[in-house]
């Protein structure tokens, strides 16, 4: 499997610096969430788009995903999604990440929201297919449980729409990797990895930690993915932008890469 890193790890660095460092450590690709420390604006001018593409080419790193802030249950997600699909196509990226958003607790309202989100995705499929860019719904927010993402994907029968399996959020919801793999079988377009431990003193109850030092079963996640024939990217999502107290990328990203390579080598050898 090829290993990438998210630019969330670089909240202040120029994109060229982040790319150069990632390449020097041995990463194979980059997941774009921040550009020069800012969230991606899909309406960026052509010159800025070209500069991003040139920076990635110069570093020798493909842009394997473009991460949006789109929430499918939010306001007017379809227009923003089309802009992100076009942006990803410009960068020859195969994937746009989206969030599901919020869901009501009452069943009728919840079902209506799921239906509306499914219609947004279905309406975007022709553009996705034309541009050669898939849409991945992340296990996040009200869709943190893979069962909820699977419920949405069951309403959109298209190979151009799938899931982004974030290692942390389904674990928070009490799901184990084997269960997640069953729920998302055949539709995982990207696997994002991070580790965390319980931290009752924090508002969200969790603290991100170096890979292997928390309780998120990332190695088992990888085993399940390999057993299921997964051949897409593994991306390290070190969220320095959202959690400034965690280690700098110069420490965290090489550590993640070394451990992931070791785990994957062992799992692949054991599968032979």
Model-predicted regions and their roles:
Residues 1-7, 11-28, 53, 57-59, ...:
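Histidine-acidic metal/acid-base catalytic patches
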Residues 9-11, 34-36, 69-72, 100-104, ...:
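Active-site-proximal loop/turn and secondary-structure-junction residues that shape catalytic pockets
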Residues 31, 65-67, 97, 136, ...:
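Conserved beta-strand positions in the central sheet of alpha/beta enzyme cores
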Residues 16-17, 21, 54-62, 72-163, ...:
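Active-site acidic/histidine proton-transfer and metal-coordination neighborhood
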Residues 31-53, 103-106:
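Glycine-rich, proline-tolerant flexible connector loops at the mouths of alpha/beta enzymes
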